[in-house]
Amino acid sequence: MLTRKQQELLLFIHERMKESGVPPSFDEMKDALDLASKSGIHRLITALEERGFIRRLPNRARALEVIKLPEAMTSSIPPRRTGFSPSVIEGSRGKLQAVPSAPAKQVEEVRNSSSIPVMGRIAAGVPISAIQNNTHDISVPMEMLGSGEHYALEVKGDSMIEAGILDGDTVIIRNATTANPGDIVVALVDDEEATLKRFRRRGASIALEAANPAYETRIFGPDRVKIQGKLVGLIRRYH
């Protein structure tokens, strides 16, 4: 039997994975549960792991997977009405496989896909030059895309590792010019630097927040930052 805090954390991780395809950071979990420190989150995650509700994914920074939900929680979760269900796609020796973003889903080979352009590299670290032209196309599952126009970018850097985004990943981006606080976005700074960061507001300013304590949050005036798109999923290949 889970405690109330354990249930709250499990549901928060589950819902975030369904929404964005990547697990929440420890800071986000701490804030969501109104805890004073991240040590409390560590204890809750350990307890959930010991009871078989989640597991930590090896060789990834703080990456988690929900294995199951208690029956009482499953029956109380309303069906989602969003038009798409972003997820992480992992490739093994060239074959793409869908990694389930909800419990009890079986991993199956992706059949229905759409081709989208890869527009170059995006910095998850120190911003690099602005997004380049189309370099090649990749196939992405239709269920990841939903509505709107999409493109892909190859990630360079480690500033988003606590959001489950690693150096070498390919992120799937939906075209957008606006974002909500907490969204992971492609931001163009001063019309010349492109970076992948979490979008925040600091009064009238815009904060581009990393998911790695080694990187500082960067603050800009609203006229210096243009939103180029929002993260809907990512692709990871193993060679």
From Swiss-Prot:
Q: Which residues form the active site?
A: S159, K197
Catalyses: Hydrolysis of Ala-|-Gly bond in repressor LexA
Q: Which residues form the signal peptide?
A: none
Gene Ontology molecular function, alphabetical? DNA binding; serine-type endopeptidase activity
Pfam entry (one): Peptidase_S24
At the top level, the lineage of the source is Bacteria
**Which CDD domains is this protein grouped with?**
S24_LexA-like
> What residue ranges carry the coiled-coil annotation?
none
Marked site (Cleavage) residue numbers: A124, G125
List the keywords (alphabetical): Autocatalytic cleavage, DNA damage, DNA repair, DNA replication, DNA-binding, Hydrolase, Repressor, SOS response, Transcription, Transcription regulation
Q: What is its EC number?
A: 3.4.21.88
Entries under InterPro entries matching the protein: LexA, LexA-like, LexA/Signal_pep-like_sf, LexA_DNA-bd_dom, LexA_repressor, Peptidase_S24_LexA, Peptidase_S24_S26A/B/C, WH-like_DNA-bd_sf
Q: Any idea which residues the entry calls the DNA-binding region?
A: 26-46
Please provide the Gene Ontology terms (biological process) for this protein: DNA repair; DNA replication; negative regulation of DNA-templated transcription; proteolysis; SOS response
* Subunit text: Homodimer.
Query: What is this protein for, i.e. what is its function?
Result: Represses a number of genes involved in the response to DNA damage (SOS response), including recA and lexA. In the presence of single-stranded DNA, RecA interacts with LexA causing an autocatalytic cleavage which disrupts the DNA-binding part of LexA, leading to derepression of the SOS regulon and eventually DNA repair.
User: Which HAMAP family does UniProt cross-reference here?
Assistant: LexA (MF_00015)
Q: Which family does it belong to?
A: Belongs to the peptidase S24 family.
- PANTHER family with a match to the protein in the record: LEXA REPRESSOR, LEXA REPRESSOR-RELATED
Q: What is this protein called?
A: LexA repressor
Q: Which organism is it from?
A: Allorhizobium ampelinum (strain ATCC BAA-846 / DSM 112012 / S4)
